[in-house]
A protein has these predicted regions:
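Nucleotidyltransferase catalytic core that binds NTPs
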Residues: 1-273
Length: 273
């Protein structure tokens, strides 16, 4: 039996854990298609331009493990109408209860589509995303970091690194981030950062470090026994290279390059948004 086709619609600008929890809950009802609002629709709805352009929002959402596909809507389209998408016939439109739309509900009724609202309580908590099925014979790759403002640059890094093997991301625990970066860090607590990272379809599993210092992931590395430790050029410090050499782990340094056509992002800059 084919899975149920579910549609959700919105701007999904500056995606946070709450947005991903909504997508996760929607995905439990069937395959999720995101009808993504264009920049003009966000400007009209909020009075301000989106923080991230349509192409970047589309790239980010396409990497979310709870999303089957993303369809950008045309400028001028009715954002509350059931979109006409070739070969796609949804049986369910899902909204958060706080975003209930009588216009959407009426449109769904006209087309025989169920309209369902998810209560806010259903998005409570930050459950650890379950590990993806391991591919036999693939190497284990680990990356580490703070991931305090998860953005398209992180997604691109994960996309590239996951080509080397099954990717495990070890997120720095709160106390260690404060130790390394000072007061005011991290912006987001460790459970939320792990949830954001673990929602990527490129990530086999996201974990929280339990060690200290620049190689705070040592206990997790000892348990996982990865063959590759990957960093970007900014992360090539703190004795990681020597740590890997002493343990026979291949050490790879990747350049910080955004996905084609997208701007370069950094968490430090985004904290000023």
């Amino acid at each position: 039996m084919s899975p149920r086709q579910v549609i959700v619609s919105g701007g999904f600008d500056n995606v946070r854990a709450r947005n991903l929890r909504f997508l996760e809950e929607a995905s439990k009802l069937g395959e999720v298609t995101v009808a993504l609002w264009p920049d003009e629709a966000i400007q009209h709805a909020t009075g301000t331009a989106p923080k991230f352009p349509l192409a970047e929002r589309c790239y980010f959402l396409n990497a979310v493990r709870y999303v089957s596909r993303v369809v950008p809507l045309a400028a001028g389209a009715d954002m509350h109408a059931l979109p006409a998408l070739d070969g796609f016939q949804p049986s369910l439109w899902v909204d958060e209860a706080a975003e209930a739309s009588p216009a959407r509900q009426a449109g769904c009724q006209r087309h025989g589509v169920e309209y369902r609202l998810l209560p806010a309580s259903q998005m409570d908590g930050l459950p650890a995303p379950p590990p993806l099925p391991a591919a036999p014979g693939r190497k284990k790759v680990i990356v580490t970091g703070c991931y305090d403002w998860f953005h398209s640059g992180h997604v691109r890094f994960f996309e590239e690194v996951s080509s080397y093997g099954d990717l495990y991301v070890i997120v720095g625990h709160d106390a260690n981030i404060r130790l390394l970066k000072g007061e005011g860090h991290p912006l987001l607590p460790q459970d939320e950062r792990r949830y954001l990272v673990g929602s990527s379809k490129y990530v086999q599993q996201a974990l929280i470090s339990t060690g200290e210092g620049w190689v705070d992931a040592d206990p997790e590395i000892q348990r996982l026994q990865p063959q590759i430790y990957a960093v970007n050029e900014d992360g090539d410090k703190g004795g990681k290279r020597e740590y890997c050499a002493a343990r026979g782990i291949e050490y790879r340094v990747l350049q910080r390059t955004p996905a084609p056509g997208l701007p370069r992002r950094s968490s430090t800059d985004l904290r000023g948004f």
